Amino acid sequence: PPSRYVKFLTDYYKDYIDYYNYNGWGTISAVDCNQMEGLAEAVRSVILSNQDSLKNVDTADLQQYGKGSSNFKGYAYDMLQFIEKLCGGMAPDDFTQQLKKTVVYTGYTHDPTSSLYRIDGDNYSGMGMYIPNSFTTPKYLLWNNYFKSSIAWYHASGWAETESIWGN
């Protein structure tokens, strides 16, 4: 990020992380929203180029944010780790470069004292995303329908074109 933001981000990050190290767990990211369209295109390109592998990605193997809460379990997975798994272990360079332009600052609680949940720093890119699935429980059916009907990312990132693969 531009140098004028670094001190602000560093100070804010420190206060936020210090608080959540003692009150649960936390992640924080600064995103250049002007880059989101480029990120959607990069994700779309990877998803559509690797759609035959979509069913092979086991979300149980991915870093999941909020998994300690039944309200949020299954809703947000680390984007970079998902793309790496989808591509057989290595994310394409153009995707990685776009992610770096989009997510300009990240942080997480390294050792929260009051939570059993830990962020895996090796699999934390600062950007999570919902991964639609074929689960038929009411919770997932509701969220898949909401994702399809109300969130622009569904169409922008290529999920709409792959529904016949992951859908139910």
Give the role of each language-model region.
Residues P1-N168:
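Terminal, contiguous helix-loop blocks that mediate binding/assembly
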